[in-house]
A protein has these predicted regions:
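Nucleotide-activated chemistry modules centered on ATP-dependent adenylation/adenylyltransferase
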Residues: 1-186
Length: 186
């Protein structure tokens, strides 16, 4: 299941389209909450007189890890909530739908879904167990002790699939300098 934030680089959407054709053992399903970029713009520019105008920024849109200045001038990074709200929740919602569970109903006791998450060894700090009793997580790349470079080398060795780029929202401040340069150029 691919969770689309609505603000991914073009190459991510191209690779998803490739995978939809290349994967034959199961469908590649796309889910989305909404467009994170549009949500950020709307939150920063509420319509005068609307209910949105009186809500806190955090109450209207999940916080991406952006830098912000406090009234006193001190600068800090906002708490990161965007991955959970724009990826984890929509994926879990789709899993419940695929299980036939209606909103606000419990997943049947004894049901177990195993999700595989593509986190490499250089991102091991991002591993988090699912907080739902019916959902277990596996990290195959971690189990195979594969770093991002190992994954790229595997792609080079098999010469079967196009090389995927690093997936992350365009506006995410966690990009490496080469990613920023590539986005600026392309």
């Amino acid at each position: 299941i691919f969770a689309d934030t609505g603000w991914e680089p073009k190459f991510v959407y191209e690779h998803v389209e490739y995978l939809k054709k290349a994967i034959t053992i199961c469908p590649l399903i796309t889910v989305e909450r909404s467009n994170i970029r549009e949500d950020l713009i709307r939150a920063a520019n509420p319509i005068k007189g609307s209910n949105e105008e009186h809500k806190s920024f955090a109450g209207r849109v999940p916080n991406p890890p952006l830098f912000a200045a406090q009234p006193g001038g001190r600068v800090g990074m906002l708490y990161r909530q965007c991955t959970h709200d724009y990826k984890v929740i929509p994926i879990q919602k789709k899993m419940r739908e695929l299980l036939g569970v209606k909103p606000r109903h419990r997943v049947k006791k004894g049901t177990v879904v195993e999700q595989w998450i593509g986190i490499s060894t250089d991102e091991a700090m991002r591993m988090k167990n699912a907080r739902l009793p019916w959902l277990t997580s596996r990290w195959p790349l971690i189990e195979m002790k594969m770093s991002r470079m190992d994954c790229l080398q595997w792609y080079r060795d098999i010469k079967k699939h196009p090389m995927p780029g690093k997936s992350s929202c365009i506006g995410c401040p966690y990009h490496h300098n080469d990613q920023w340069k590539n986005m600026q150029k392309n």
